[in-house]
Amino acid sequence: MEDGVLKEGFLVKRGHIVHNWKARWFILRQNTLLYYKLEGGRRVTPPKGRIVLDGCTITCPCLEYENRPLLIKLKTRTSTEYFLEACSREERDSWAFEITGAIHAGQPGKIQQLHILKNSFKLPPHISLHRIVDKMHDTSTGIRPSPNMEQGSTYKKTFLGSSLVDWLISSNFAASRLEAVTLASMLMEENFLRPVGVRSMGAIRSGDLAEQFLDDSTALYTFAESYKKKVSSKEEISLSTMELSGTVVKQGYLSKQGHKRKNWKVRRFVLRKDPAFLHYYDPSKEENRPVGGFSLRGSLVSALEDNGVPTGVKGNVQGNLFKVITKDDTHYYIQASSKAERAEWIEAIKKLT
């Protein structure tokens, strides 16, 4: 990393004039967040734009877009709003932590609060949020939504915040009420649950990360619409139930060479095991469905040389490249943002081939 750079990597940014979403390379410095356009796997200089952090406010998690639950919102001193999407909850929280640190540099009390926050949201490795939600939907042992009343209004198919905390503990997903609240907050952040009614919506607006979910018998929640599987064909049924049923092992933004036009585009890659698949998503699209993917059974993965443009790579793209050859001899050319990131992906994929 260059001198003075606090963090760098891909984020998906909402456009100012046309509200489309595009992947940009972001570089965080002490008081500035720069973002660059990419062409041929390389960032184009000068930067496409810069966000001055002095006087900025940050909202994380930002729930303004239902289909984009991993957002950070920055509001500058001049009230310009930036919406930035990360590839995972961990990466979003890492960016939010570093950006908040850059905003509050020179205020030790704020930095100490940040360190407490950073260490408070850890999901145990043996627990999958998808598994928790599946169990919640179980007709015999799950949590049963029912009509609930709040301030004179009746909300159908809801459950109480305190009831969910009770259920998480009784189902052995959490050992204490504090742990259960943390888990419930994660489920809400990842768009599996949503708040309903005045009490729970008010907690979201308070902006306090530690108090997003309320262990309260007056706070109402429901399953988010995004959890309901929209199935329109036999092909989609087989894709969602088999390929996408595995446990997520790793995810992140990588550049990929297209098969037909050979152009390079940033995609969000998700590596799953049991069954072993590597899928990739178009981060500019709203729907959370892969645009491609392949089974890793019988695949080969290897790093490509860093000196010059390797064989099979189109354009002047070089550095941090690796290749996956599938069982049916399809070649995928992928570029990481650093040697370390490339090594991590290769190691993770090799374990599943």
UniProtKB/Swiss-Prot annotation:
InterPro entries according to UniProt: DEP_dom (IPR000591), PH-like_dom_sf (IPR011993), PH_domain (IPR001849), Pleckstrin (IPR037370), PLEK2_DEP (IPR037369), WH-like_DNA-bd_sf (IPR036388), WH_DNA-bd_sf (IPR036390)
N-acetylmethionine: residues bearing it: M1
Residue numbers bearing the Phosphoserine modification: S120
Protein location: Cell projection, Lamellipodium membrane; Cytoplasm, Cytoskeleton
CDD domains for the chain: DEP_PLEK2, PH1_Pleckstrin_2, PH2_Pleckstrin_2
GO molecular function: phosphatidylinositol-3,4-bisphosphate binding; phosphatidylinositol-3,5-bisphosphate binding; phosphatidylinositol-3-phosphate binding
Highest taxon, organism lineage: Eukaryota
Tissue: Ubiquitous. Most abundant in the thymus, large bowel, small bowel, stomach, and prostate.
GO biological process terms, semicolon-separated: actin cytoskeleton organization; intracellular signal transduction; positive regulation of cell projection organization; positive regulation of plasma membrane bounded cell projection assembly
Gene3D superfamilies linked: Pleckstrin-homology domain (PH domain)/Phosphotyrosine-binding domain (PTB), Winged helix-like DNA-binding domain superfamily/Winged helix DNA-binding domain
Ranges for domain DEP: 139-225
A Pfam family matched in the record: DEP
Stated role: May help orchestrate cytoskeletal arrangement. Contribute to lamellipodia formation. Overexpression of pleckstrin 2 causes large lamellipodia and peripheral ruffle formation.
Name of this chain's protein: Pleckstrin-2
Source organism of the structure: Mus musculus
